[in-house]
Amino acid sequence: MRRYTVYGGSFDPVHCGHMSLVERAVALDYEVIMVPTFRHAFGKQSAPFEHRVRMCELALQACQLVEHARVCTIERSLAPASGAPVYTYDVLCHLRAQLGSAPCLLVGPDISAEWERWYRHTEIDQEFGRLCLPLTHMIRSTDIRQRLRAGEAPTSLSDVIPEPVAAYIAAHGLYR
């Protein structure tokens, strides 16, 4: 029976730190389902959803993880018309029904530090569990966006974002 873990995030943009978590979960014999947020639960504004989904797909291809990881756009179909956010608990419940087993939630220590703010965090722990992996790359999407807005060329950031993601950012003029 396959073991699944769900890795949700803004992925704005996806970077090598994100991919390191995916690689390590795969090494632990999990199939990783990356779920970009459609509407952030804490109101954070992001690049358009379709761009973030495509960047995640490119990152998985670049890191040769497509056999063990995939991008899932379930948040778009679950998003209420009211503009309310989609909560992780609801995503996990829907994926459990689709997969036939309960996936655990892949998180880094940054999420663990704010875990009690999350909607139905106790139920997530009880029904799904968390796979908490330490960060090996101290990279923040916020810092990447700031560097790009300051005029740094996306291709100069290949140490922190996969090259196809950098090329995509440049081609679409994101984060200017």
Walk through the language-model features, giving the residues of each.
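Nucleotidyltransferase catalytic core that binds NTPs
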Residues: 1-176
